[in-house]
C-alpha cells in the first residue's frame, strides 16, 4: 500500500508553522491512518546537521550551488530515513517544504535557474512528488513585515539577510510553479485570519482525499 504525501509551501512569513501547529491535531482526530509531520531542511539526524550548516548566519561565503546541493543532500537523507518508510506503510506524511522550496529559493531567489535545481532534486528524490501541495500565499512585504514583528520569537538565520529583490524572485518562482502544476498545487490566501487559513487547508485535504477520513 502506498501512503499519501502532502507538502506545505510558502514564502518567508506565510505562517506555515502556525497553520500546521493548529491543523495537524485536527487532521489526526479524523484520519484513518497514522499521520507524520516533518520538515525540510531537516527531519532526520543527518539532515538536521546539514540544516545547521545551510542556515548558519556565519556562512556568508556559501556559494549558491553549494547551498542548492546541500538542500538536495539533506532532502535525500530525509526521504530515505523518514518519508519513504512512512509512505511504504500506507501512512500520511505532511512535510513543511519540499522540492518546490529549492526551485523557488535557489532556482529563483539565487538565480541558478528552476530547471537546473529541479533536475538536481529529481535525482535526489528519484522523482517522488507530493500528491498535494498547499501553497500559503502572502505578498512579499507582508511576509517580511510578519517576520520583523516576530523577530524575538524566532531564530535568526542566513536567509534573513537577503534583500527584498531576492524574496520577490522567490515569490515569482512560486507563482510559475503554481501555473505549471495546477493539479498538484492549491494556493491558499494566507492573509486571512489563522482560523480561516487552517479551515481552508483542512477542507482542501478532505476534498482531495475523502478515503482517508472517518
UniProtKB/Swiss-Prot annotation:
Q: Name one GO cellular component term.
A: cytosol
What are the entry keywords? ATP-binding, Kinase, Nucleotide biosynthesis, Nucleotide-binding, Transferase
One Pfam family matching this protein: Thymidylate_kin
Return the EC number: 2.7.4.9
Q: Which reaction does it catalyse?
A: dTMP + ATP = dTDP + ADP
Instruction: Write out the GO biological process terms.
Output: dTDP biosynthetic process; dTTP biosynthetic process; dUDP biosynthetic process
Q: InterPro entries, alphabetically?
A: P-loop_NTPase, Thymidylate_kin-like_dom, Thymidylate_kin_CS, Thymidylate_kinase
For this protein, the record's SUPFAM superfamilies field holds: P-loop containing nucleoside triphosphate hydrolases
One term of GO molecular function: dTMP kinase activity
Function noted in UniProt:
Phosphorylation of dTMP to form dTDP in both de novo and salvage pathways of dTTP synthesis.
NCBIfam families xref list:
DTMP_kinase
Which family does the UniProt entry place this protein in? Belongs to the thymidylate kinase family.
What protein name is recorded for this chain? Thymidylate kinase
Identify the species of origin. Lacticaseibacillus paracasei (strain ATCC 334 / BCRC 17002 / CCUG 31169 / CIP 107868 / KCTC 3260 / NRRL B-441) (Lactobacillus paracasei)
**Which gene is transcribed and translated to give this protein?**
tmk
Amino acid at each position: 500500500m502506498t501512503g499519501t504525501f502532502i507538502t506545505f509551501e510558502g514564502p518567508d512569513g506565510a505562517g506555515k508553522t502556525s497553520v500546521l501547529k493548529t491543523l495537524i491535531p485536527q487532521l489526526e482526530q479524523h484520519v484513518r491512518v497514522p499521520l507524520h509531520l516533518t520538515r525540510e531542511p531537516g527531519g532526520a539526524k543527518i539532515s538536521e546537521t546539514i540544516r545547521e550548516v545551510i542556515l548558519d548566519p556565519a556562512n556568508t561565503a556559501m556559494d549558491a550551488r553549494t547551498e542548492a546541493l546541500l538542500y538536495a543532500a539533506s532532502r535525500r537523507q530525509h526521504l530515505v530515513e523518514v518519508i519513504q518508510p512512512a509512505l511504504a506503510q500506507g501512512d500520511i506524511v505532511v512535510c513543511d517544504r519540499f522540492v518546490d522550496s529549492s526551485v523557488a529559493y535557489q532556482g529563483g531567489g539565487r538565480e541558478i535557474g528552476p530547471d537546473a535545481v529541479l533536475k538536481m532534486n529529481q535525482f535526489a528524490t528519484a522523482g517522488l512528488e507530493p500528491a498535494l501541495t498547499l501553497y500559503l500565499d502572502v505578498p512579499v512585504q507582508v511576509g517580511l513585515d510578519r517576520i520583523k514583528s516576530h523577530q524575538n520569537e524566532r531564530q535568526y538565520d542566513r536567509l534573513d539577510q537577503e534583500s527584498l529583490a531576492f524574496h520577490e524572485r522567490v515569490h515569482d518562482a512560486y507563482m510559475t510553479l503554481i501555473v505549471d502544476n495546477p493539479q498538484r498545487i492549491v494556493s491558499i490566501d494566507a492573509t486571512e485570519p489563522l482560523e480561516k487559513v487552517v479551515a481552508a487547508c483542512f477542507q482542501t485535504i478532505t476534498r482531495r482525499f475523502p478515503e482517508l477520513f472517518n
